[in-house]
Amino acid sequence: MPVNRYRPFAEEVEHIRVTDRTWPDRVIDRAPLWCAVDLRDGNQALIDPMSPARKRRMFDLLVRMGYKEIEVGFPSASQTDFDFVREIITEGAIPDDVTIQVLTQCRPELIERTFEACAGASKVIVHFYNSTSILQRRVVFRADRAAVEAIATDGARRCVEEAAKYPDTQWRFEYSPESYTGTELEYAKQVCDAVAEVIQPTPENPIIFNLPATVEMATPNVYADSIEWMSRNLANRESVILSLHPHNDRGTAVAAAELGFAAGADRIEGCLFGNGERTGNVCLATLGLNLFSRGVDPQIDFSNIDEIRRTVEYCNQLPVPERHPYGGDLVYTAFSGSHQDAINKGLDAMEFDADAADSDMDDMLWQVPYLPIDPKDVGRTYEAVIRVNSQSGKGGVAYIMKADHGLALPRRLQIEFSRAIQEIAEGSAGEGGEVSPKEMWDAFAEEYLAPVRPLERIKQRVIAAEEDGGTTSIDATVKIDGKEAEISGSGNGPLAAFVHALGTVGFDVAVLDYSEHAMSAGDDAQAAAYVEASVAGKTVWGVGIAPSITTASLRAVVSAINRASR
């Protein structure tokens, strides 16, 4: 590959030196100001830009989620955008606590058209920009620093003039030195300070300086250093809201945003699920839920992540990848056996700790391996947390049997049954395919519940001991190889009595382990019983399910005998 055609960032732009940087030691303990730009930066990157109906659906979603600043379009560049801005203003769709933002270049006629679109709105941020990078100054504008700075300051003056024509609107201003990451820091500061001289911001009405990684050009620490330098050196900093707008060209937009925020920024612009030009804008869902996962309130409601994703997919006509953080179909799913086992044990420990604390599990500190957040907190269920394929082990099988079918399999039975499931998975077209919960249940029923040869229990009558330690007797009707027989026995309980009775007709059975549980809560709950037995010297497991625990335990013995005869 022709690596000689490329050069280090320090050679292409400059070597950013912040030797006394403080951002590496800072811990993010609050949410930034958010601005969602799905309707503008996101929309302009779509193969088929949003229709008015899709735009409105996206806007309403962002409002419901709690975004207070929403960039709604580029009204001077598109009649569709102009009409949409007019629609949400005239129809009263903008809540009192939401400020719309509109984008414009610095040309006078475009600024004028932008203000026309916003007439009648209560609160508006006018976002004007021009590119300041070394490369664009040379190849696009063919202009020197002074000329490019003049574009920005002339645009600022025109914005102030137009705002005066609409005194009933609360105007705020945002300026972006576009392609900031390709601009010398000292020059970026110079242009921003010159714009501020025109706008005359105050702490009560600050200007927003948005420093976009229009193209991501270096590692996130370089971006963070540049943000800390700008935050320290901008004039009149108390009257400035420092905003970030990272793109994802190098795949590190989230890291750049988080480090830039730690470095002194106040605000972040992005799109839900990272839509945007080329590789996209920074993902607002990832940023917000990263905060949430560390106990910081993002001030945005992600409690129904699937509804959010469906709406975004509909509006953008683009799918959200299955592995996208927090929102993808597979992000809370484990196929690996060791992962499944750890998750299963973690959930069991959570349940145990909640019971010990007499608390609801939803109120407990979340601590489950491999799951950074509780899927339920974003509206997911546990049904898809563990899925079984040829890479899975007993933990995954045990989890699904308990979560989906109410069976808490003993550990050795987990191991035995997981082998059968692995054989099924490896036999799926020879490709290690997935085994669904239904397929798993069908296999379990076929292996442990269905066989009726050589032994089938028909009915029984149990006479319990009147005193503890007394003898229980049983009379049972069974079929042996299809022929009905009456058997009787006694023992220290129904199970022992039944085993004794079976011995009288030639079945050599010794119970090695036994457990039981209700499969659900309530008076009508089914009971499950598990028997590990030695049948004619062969150790096998049997399972019984019935409305009564006595019948379930006898069925488990019958299951073990029939499995031993295979």
Curated annotation (Swiss-Prot):
| Every Pyruvate carboxyltransferase domain range | 32-306
Enzyme Commission number: 2.3.3.13
MF-aspect GO terms: 2-isopropylmalate synthase activity; acetyl-CoA C-acetyltransferase activity; magnesium ion binding
Report the domain of life of the source organism.
Bacteria
Q: Broadest EC class?
A: transferase
Instruction: From the UniProt record, list the reaction(s) this protein catalyses.
Output: 3-methyl-2-oxobutanoate + acetyl-CoA + H2O = (2S)-2-isopropylmalate + CoA + H(+)
Please name the SMART domains in this protein's record: LeuA_dimer
Q: Where in the cell is it found?
A: Cytoplasm
Q: Name one GO cellular component term.
A: cytoplasm
**Where along this sequence does the record place binding of Mg(2+)?**
D41, H245, H247, N281
Per the record, the pathway is: Amino-acid biosynthesis; L-leucine biosynthesis; L-leucine from 3-methyl-2-oxobutanoate: step 1/4
Q: What GO biological process terms does the UniProt entry carry, in alphabetical order?
A: L-leucine biosynthetic process
Keywords for this protein: Amino-acid biosynthesis, Branched-chain amino acid biosynthesis, Cytoplasm, Leucine biosynthesis, Magnesium, Metal-binding, Transferase
Q: Which HAMAP family match?
A: LeuA_type2
The family annotation for this protein states:
Belongs to the alpha-IPM synthase/homocitrate synthase family. LeuA type 2 subfamily.
The protein's matches in PANTHER family, at most eight in alphabetical order, are given as: 2-ISOPROPYLMALATE SYNTHASE, PTHR46911
Name of the molecule in the record: 2-isopropylmalate synthase
**Which lineage ranks, top first, belong to the organism behind this chain?**
Bacteria, Bacillati, Actinomycetota, Actinomycetes, Mycobacteriales
